[in-house]
């Protein structure tokens, strides 16, 4: 006996019956038995693609709106509409064939294709829009069926007494009542199971085919005749017309060539090209039936393109033939005033009646089934959270009965429109939007040039995809600008909602492939030989030992990069030769999650090395790509203090919402547990003074600027969710001391190191978090030059700042007493005294104790490794208890005074 996994053969819901849970890791139902696994039916091209596609495109519009289209649009406009519609769907068919032959399409149909191609945000939003299109289409078919029933069994508009078979009273509320009863029947059948349609589909196709044959041969048998047709409008105002059926007649054909848009007798609204096209296009919305069957076909790469194209060509031929028959045999009045014109002029009217009932009822039921399967797929993917969570529940046989109930309720709302023509425009707009999304998915895959995008169907290009997108969007606005604008606004709102929820998935993100493609292209264009000092910007490599003690520094350097490269580097001590696996690769997700938590724009580069020095050398050489490589190395300061654990201070880490979803497999507890505790008194140091100073020397030898950062743990939190950001207060200052304080009088304020220091301070002052801070530059002078010397020094420096376009307050600092403490030139063999260093430190405290951050000149490191400890001791004394301080040594020109 067939179960819920029996392949459907009608209306685009075929593979939706498959075991969707298998592809998503299990059902989301509560306690329901899992679906029994059965081998998929192996279908050929005819039964697997042609039959479902033909049935999907031969809906109620074929029988009840073909005359409406020809009557209002005329033969020429009608054929133009047909060509435009089939041109649009043909472009989309090419995209469908390409995507579907690049992998099996599972439950969800178009939603599955779009979501797995474009990612969860776009896929989820378009999937919901496509679901709404299916809901509205179901309403169209139900209203069309009721309309067909009323044509046979409805009382005459001018009579209140039943006559023969015409026993059903007519009116708006009666239409809603009858539609609700039909919809209830559809819902009950859908709750029982969808396998009924898998058995009946070929029989339905035979019935529809017999009806079509009777329509085509009727002009050869039925003789010309006249009719009296009465329509009742508001206030029981009745109008009777007397159209005629002429048989094949050249005069009739000539009269029906041009358009004659007039009032629609069912809605009493004026028709136009757009409104008629909207009704006609609903007959072209079943083209995805074959693509949805890819998992059930013997040879999907051959059957989907061949079957879909053959089915579309067949339906196009039938529609053209019917347009020609109606234009040649029925006068305009008959076409405008009777939707059931095929039944009125048929050799045996019940042929058409049976065809209408079979086509519309099966279409309505299968649209409901298709919509419920899309909703079920959305619920299983958990994109919209709790509102759709119940829709994931299934019966023991796998029938998503809750999704059916959801869909029934929404379709019931559409039935209050009361007329097929009223909601046909909405259906068309939603379907066009879905088709545009399919074309966009194929275009994105083609542009991304991913090696794994190798569809066996090759008759497409980015030109066809782009043309399909443009055609769909243009026709949307031609049909109804209001509906189109509203649908796009709804789509954007759904996109923003899903982007805000940031759902993670294993489907892959097409955006990443497109970004990679574009970044690669532009990186190749970024030629380091064309670098110019005018366009210099910081490209920073920040070495991080343990993020627990470095988060404030990471956030600070993020402000310092000025749109340049920012890389967090970390060296894992070890030797790959003696390790069973690389310990670095599993760490990347934790570091990237840390970057997300801090809200910084940084890359992460980790390496395995026997020593920190060798690892830093590796990173300085290989970090970056092309013209984007670090030009500045930032290190934490080397001293004997014990670091503080930032994770215990910032609410983002210590009070984070542990119920929030993980970030690509890394939740907050995992992130906290991954990084080791900070160093304490008993912990051995992985880095010795000689190695630390050697790293500074290596960076200078490699032409990298160097910055040493001290006391940045004193800065308040600046990560996402923090309530305070430093530099926001206009009273905060950035203090710059652009001279080598260890060699008084021997350094110029215009050397490379001083200018680099000024540039970095200016860059920080330009950052959004520090824009309101005041920049102060301290110029140290000796009073021996008297007042005129002081003024000359200040004027000279002010002129330099003017050329560099740096806005800053210049502070003149007399340091005669400090300078006298230097016994001679500061050399490696004769360093400055401890008293001098303490005096300079006191001078800095006196003038910069309230600064938010200080920029100091970093002296050259000693060439001898024996003097490394002495060098670090000097720096320690110089910056002791100052607060956040950056010691900077520049080796590259970074300023320009010319245009």
From Swiss-Prot:
GO terms for molecular function: potassium:chloride symporter activity. The chain crosses the membrane at residues 43-63, 79-99, 126-146, 176-196, 202-222, 270-290, 307-327, 351-371, 374-394, 400-420, 422-442, 456-476, 488-510, 564-584, 750-770. Glycans are attached at residues 228, 236, 249. One of its GO terms (biological process) is chloride ion homeostasis. It is found in: Cell membrane; Lysosome membrane. Residues 64-78, 147-175, 223-269, 328-350, 395-399, 443-455, 477-487, 585-749 are extracellular. It is a multi-pass membrane protein. Residues 1-42, 100-125, 197-201, 291-306, 372-373, 421, 511-563, 771-899 are cytoplasmic. It holds the Pfam family AA_permease. Keywords: Cell membrane, Glycoprotein, Lysosome, Membrane, Transmembrane, Transmembrane helix, Transport. GO terms for cellular component: lysosomal membrane; plasma membrane. Seems to correspond to a subunit of a multimeric transport system and thus, additional subunits may be required for its function. May play a role in lysosomal ion flux and osmoregulation. Belongs to the SLC12A transporter family. This is Solute carrier family 12 member 9. It comes from Danio rerio. The gene is slc12a9.
């Amino acid at each position: 006996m067939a179960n819920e996994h029996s392949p459907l053969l009608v209306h685009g819901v075929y593979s939706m019956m498959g075991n969707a849970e298998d592809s998503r890791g299990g059902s989301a139902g509560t306690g329901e038995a899992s679906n029994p696994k059965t081998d998929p039916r192996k279908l050929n091209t005819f039964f697997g693609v042609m039959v479902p596609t033909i049935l999907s495109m031969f809906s109620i519009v074929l029988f009840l709106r073909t005359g409406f289209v020809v009557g209002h649009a005329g033969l020429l406009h009608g054929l133009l509409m047909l060509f435009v519609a089939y041109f649009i769907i043909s472009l989309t068919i090419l995209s469908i064939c390409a995507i579907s032959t690049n992998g099996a399409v599972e439950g969800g149909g178009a939603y599955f294709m779009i979501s797995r191609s474009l990612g969860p945000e776009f896929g989820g939003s378009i999937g919901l829009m496509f679901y709404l299109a299916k809901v509205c289409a179901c309403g169209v078919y139900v209203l069309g069926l009721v309309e067909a029933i009323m044509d046979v069994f409805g009382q005459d508009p001018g009579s209140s007494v039943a006559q023969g078979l015409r026993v059903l009273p007519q009116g708006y509320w009666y239409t809603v009542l009858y539609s609700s009863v039909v919809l209830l029947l559809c819902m009950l059948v859908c709750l029982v199971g969808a396998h009924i349609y898998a058995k009946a589909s070929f029989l339905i196709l035979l019935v529809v085919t017999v009806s079509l044959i009777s329509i085509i041969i009727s002009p050869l048998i039925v003789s010309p005749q006249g009719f009296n047709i009465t329509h009742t409008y508001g206030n029981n105002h009745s109008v009777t017309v007397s159209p005629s059926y002429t048989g094949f007649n050249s005069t009739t054909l000539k009269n029906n060539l041009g358009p004659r848009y007039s009032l629609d007798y069912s809605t009493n609204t004026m028709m136009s090209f757009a409104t008629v096209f909207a009704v006609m296009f609903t007959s072209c919305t079943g083209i995805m039936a074959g693509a949805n069957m890819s998992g059930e076909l013997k040879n999907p790469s051959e059957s989907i393109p061949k079957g879909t194209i053959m089915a579309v060509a067949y339906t196009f031929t039938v529609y053209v033939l019917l347009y020609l028959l109606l234009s040649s045999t029925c006068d305009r009045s008959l076409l405008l005033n009777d939707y059931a014109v095929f039944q009125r002029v048929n050799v045996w009217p019940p042929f058409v009646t049976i065809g209408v009932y079979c086509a519309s009822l099966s279409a309505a039921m299968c649209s409901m089934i298709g919509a419920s399967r899309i909703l079920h797929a959305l619920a299983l993917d958990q994109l919209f959270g709790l509102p759709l969570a119940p829709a994931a529940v299934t019966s023991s046989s796998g029938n998503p009965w809750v999704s059916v109930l959801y869909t029934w309720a929404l379709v019931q709302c559409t039935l209050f429109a009361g007329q097929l023509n009223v909601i046909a425009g909405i259906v068309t707009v939603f379907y066009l939007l879905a088709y545009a999304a399919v074309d966009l998915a194929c275009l994105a895959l083609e542009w991304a040039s991913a090696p794994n995008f190798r569809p066996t169907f090759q008759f497409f290009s980015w030109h066809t995809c782009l043309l399909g997108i443009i055609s769909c969007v243009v026709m949307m606005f031609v049909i109804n600008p209001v509906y189109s604008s509203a649908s796009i606004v709804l789509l954007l709102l759904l996109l923003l909602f899903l982007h805000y929820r940031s759902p993670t998935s294993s489907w892959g993100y097409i955006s990443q492939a497109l970004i990679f493609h574009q970044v690669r292209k532009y990186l190749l264009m970024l030629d380091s030989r064309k670098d110019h000092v005018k366009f210099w910007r910081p490209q920073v490599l920040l070495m991080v030992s343990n993020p627990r003690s470095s988060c404030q520094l990471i956030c600070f350097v993020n402000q310092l990069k000025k749109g340049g490269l920012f890389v967090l580097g970390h060296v894992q001590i070890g030797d790959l030769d003696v390790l069973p696996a690389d310990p670095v690769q599993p760490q990347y997700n934790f570091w990237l999650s840390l970057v997300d938590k801090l809200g910084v724009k940084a890359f992460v580069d980790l390496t395995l090395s026997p020593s920190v020095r060798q690892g830093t050398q590796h990173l300085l050489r290989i970090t970056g790509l092309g013209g984007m490589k670090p030009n500045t190395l930032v290190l934490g300061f080397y001293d004997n203090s014990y670091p503080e654990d930032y994770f215990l201070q910032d609410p983002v880490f210590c009070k984070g919402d542990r119920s929030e979803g993980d970030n690509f497999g890394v939740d907050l507890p995992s992130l906290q547990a991954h990084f080791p505790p900070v160093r304490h008194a008993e912990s051995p140091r992985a880095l010795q003074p000689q190695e630390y100073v050697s790293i500074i020397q290596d960076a200078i030898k490699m032409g990298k600027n160097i910055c040493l950062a001290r006391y940045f743990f004193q800065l308040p939190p600046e990560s996402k969710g923090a309530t305070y950001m430093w530099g926001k207060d206009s009273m905060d200052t950035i203090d710059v001391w652009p001279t080598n304080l260890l060699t008084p009088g021997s350094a110029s304020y215009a050397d490379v190191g001083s200018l680099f220091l000024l540039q970095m301070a200016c860059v920080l002052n330009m950052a959004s978090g520090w824009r309101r801070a005041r920049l102060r530059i301290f110029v140290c002078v000796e009073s021996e030059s008297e007042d005129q010397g002081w003024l000359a020094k200040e004027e000279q420096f002010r002129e330099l700042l003017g050329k560099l376009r740096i806005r800053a307050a210049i502070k003149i600092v007399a340091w005669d007493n400090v300078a006298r403490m230097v016994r001679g030139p500061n050399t490696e063999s004769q360093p400055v005294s401890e008293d001098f260093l303490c005096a300079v430190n006191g001078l800095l405290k006196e003038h910069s104790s309230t600064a938010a951050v200080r920029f100091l000149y970093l002296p050259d490191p000693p060439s001898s490794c024996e003097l490394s400890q002495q060098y670090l001791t000097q720096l320690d004394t110089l910056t002791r208890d100052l607060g956040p301080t950056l010691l900077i040594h520049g080796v590259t020109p970074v300023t320009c005074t010319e245009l």
